[in-house]
């Protein structure tokens, strides 16, 4: 769009034919504010769009489009039923002092509205967005930099630390809760101005805040040395371009920052070599890191060279995509090459049996938002690492994740993207499992994904609980809940309605 503006649209295209199926006006239009109110006088910041797919009702996918993140922020959610693209709500975010403390106003499709007091997305956005169920209510939230947008368009939480370049969201410490790591350019904490910082938090509480001396263009957090994680109890580590070391979740330095040919490798993490720690990807360089010895090796052929192909986004050095495309829980790397693309995949065997990562809806949603803004690594909703492996009755470690460390995972025959998933309701009467039955028994032996896992209609697997609080679990895996509180307890039968 030129500097003089013009119409903007949101269009649904047929994925098989490329045909436009429906087009609506983009909401809101750029003209809703003057250029200076977007954060500059030449219109660039009015065009800061972010986008995501999220299961806002726990069952159906919604498209969430946002506009602006340096100052005013608008977020709109849409549903698509195969024919009509309909707006669910529009969230308008302003300075809290502008409207008597009301920082967020949400207007719904039915004409109703809702306000937030002293909470706003205003000036809190990052160059990326994440999707996760951070409050374990069964509905996806949108992690929007230093604030979290709830499934209904209101602001769930807001810390006021402002804009940043990088964010990562997962259960980094295997406690069944989502942690949020973010690198900030500017903001404040307890009324103290902090120009630059990294922090780790849950949606409603701080874990660690580390001040920095300059702009933090990149930062990352993950389990990158699984042997160290298991032996030390530091299950995930973080580092950034603004610090001189690698740190545990408490902010304590535990090792030297990775360095490979001048790169600190704080860009991307991928599962590649078959152990449960992630390798580091910066541009087309793929390396393995050790806390004790530093970078151990560069992967790709006998010359330890970079993967052939071109990278994207200049200094951000992104692949086109990283994802578990082929289902072996390791991740493929997609790079531009000439006038096409190359997909690189690991040929290294693994001893571990993990569910395909794309069956975790948080990970699947991450693949959808990965290319938005500054690309960020996708993460599962659960911790992956040796510290989370199951044990048998004799205390021997097994080669799959313990049920207490994983959320609901389900496979189902996806005959139609637009068909609502069945509702799962708990029942107290045990039943006999038969092929193609509508009722089935779920017990502790099925929760970890073993060979005894029961199949419904030859394709659907589900884990549920006898807890009254979980009597209505929707979405067959699109809603996730923590099983750790039920560890050691017998789970009961359930009925598909």
Model regions: which residues?
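Exposed beta-strand and adjacent loop surfaces of beta-rich binding modules
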Residues: 7, 430, 493
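Short beta-strand/loop motifs in extracellular/secreted proteins, especially
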Residues: 73, 477, 489-492
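Flexible, small-residue-rich N-terminal segments that precede or flank a structured functional core
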Residues: 422-483
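A short beta-strand element within beta-rich, extracytoplasmic domains
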Residues: 481, 490-497
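A general secondary-structure signal for short beta-strands and their flanking turns/coil
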Residues: 46, 474-476, 493
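Acidic glycine-/aspartate-rich tracts in secreted/extracellular proteins
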Residues: 485-487
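Beta-propeller-forming repeat regions
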Residues: 1-422
């Amino acid at each position: 769009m030129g500097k003089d503006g013009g119409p903007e649209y949101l269009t649904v295209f047929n994925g098989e034919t490329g045909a436009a199926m429906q087009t609506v006006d983009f909401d809101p239009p750029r003209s809703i504010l003057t250029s200076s109110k977007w954060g500059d006088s030449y219109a660039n910041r009015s065009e800061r769009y972010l986008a995501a797919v999220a299961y806002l009702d726990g069952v159906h996918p919604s498209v969430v489009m946002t506009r602006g993140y340096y100052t005013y922020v608008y977020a709109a959610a849409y549903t698509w039923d195969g024919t009509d693209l309909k707006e669910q709500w529009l969230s308008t975010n302003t300075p809290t002092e502008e409207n008597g403390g009301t920082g967020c106003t949400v207007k719904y499709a039915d004409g109703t509205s809702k306000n937030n007091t002293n909470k706003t997305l205003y000036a809190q956005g990052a160059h990326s967005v994440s999707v996760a169920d951070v409050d374990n209510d069964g509905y996806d939230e949108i992690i929007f930099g230093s604030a979290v947008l709830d499934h209904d368009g209101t602001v769930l939480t807001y810390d006021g630390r402002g804009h940043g370049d990088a964010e990562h969201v997962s259960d980094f410490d295997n406690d069944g809760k989502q942690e949020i790591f973010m690198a900030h350019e500017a903001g404040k904490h307890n009324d103290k101005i902090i120009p630059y910082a990294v922090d780790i938090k849950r949606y409603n509480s701080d874990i660690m805040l580390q001040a920095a001396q300059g702009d933090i263009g990149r930062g990352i957090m993950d389990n990158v040395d699984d042997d160290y994680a298991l032996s030390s109890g530091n299950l995930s580590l973080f580092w950034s371009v603004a610090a001189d070391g690698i740190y545990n979740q408490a902010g304590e330095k535990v090792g030297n920052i990775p360095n490979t040919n001048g790169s600190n490798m704080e860009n991307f993490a991928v599962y590649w070599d078959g152990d449960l720690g992630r390798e580091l990807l910066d541009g087309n360089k793929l390396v393995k890191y050790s806390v004790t010895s530093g970078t151990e090796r560069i992967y790709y052929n006998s010359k330890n060279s970079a993967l052939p192909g071109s990278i994207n986004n200049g200094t951000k050095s992104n692949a086109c995509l990283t994802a578990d495309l082929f289902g072996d829980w390791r991740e493929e790397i997609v790079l531009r090459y000439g006038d096409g693309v190359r997909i690189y995949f690991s040929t290294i065997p693994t001893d571990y049996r993990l569910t395909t990562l794309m069956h975790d809806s948080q990970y699947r949603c991450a693949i959808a938002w990965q290319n938005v803004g500054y690309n960020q690594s996708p993460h599962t909703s659960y911790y992956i690492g040796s510290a989370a492996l199951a044990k048998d009755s004799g205390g021997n470690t097994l080669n799959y994740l313990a049920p207490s460390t994983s959320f609901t995972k389900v496979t189902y025959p996806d005959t139609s993207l637009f068909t609502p998933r069945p509702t799962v309701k708990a029942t107290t009467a045990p039943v006999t499992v038969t092929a193609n039955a509508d009722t089935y028994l779920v017990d502790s032996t099925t929760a970890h994904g073993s060979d005894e896992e029961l199949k419904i209609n030859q394709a659907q697997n589900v884990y549920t609980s006898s807890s009254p609080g979980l009597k209505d679990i929707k979405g067959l895996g699109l809603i996730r809940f923590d099983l750790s509180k039920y560890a050691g307890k017998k789970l009961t039968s359930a009925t598909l309605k």
